[in-house]
Amino acid sequence: MFQKVGDAEFVRGEHEVLKLWDQQAIFAKLRQKIAGKQPWSFLDGPITANNPMGVHHAWGRTYKDTFQRYWAMNGRDLRHQNGFDCQGLWVEVEVEKQLGLGAKSQIEAYGIDKFVHTCKQRVLKYAAIQTEQSIRLGYWMEWDDPQQLRKLAAAIGTDETVEFSPPKLPETVIRDTAEAIVAKLGNPDWGGSYFTFSTETMRPSGRSSRNVLNEEKSIGAMT
């Protein structure tokens, strides 16, 4: 009466689904279908890009993705923007271990500017890895190209001109220093993940010019 059921190859099945989504541009079609509809949003605490994603991150991201898919299926428009936390001890401590530094005086001797650039390199490196992990997880977001993030990581802190194509402008090639490009990652015109980097250019109010730019664009995007 019953036929023998073959072994369930879950990993192969997952790859087949991901390939289907990519070949048929399912996520892009969904975003096109819900564009301009009543928005639905929630505050997503950004993951710190200091190491590869852990199981606990995947657990939380699965819940977030489920909620977003549910509301998209109900015809609500979503921003679909991932965030990366780039500042604070989570990043700095890992860089201290990476460089073999154990005291504030050693960091100062190494050079604050060099230390900051090394922190940014680490963030971009692991943002690329976490992006790949999240895509593998099936997490639907407007992702940056991981290879472009790695290219920025390699050039940050130098005067080298880098080429970058934002997710929302895939046919556009932006040529600038990695520092200048990184300062604009995630802005509404470019799309892609938001990075909590700050710049050294400050306005009289004490806020960085990039933060003010993002605030202005975010307000415009939300109205």
What is the meaning of each model-derived region?
Residues 1-223:
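N-terminal, positively charged nucleic-acid-binding surface of large information/translation enzymes
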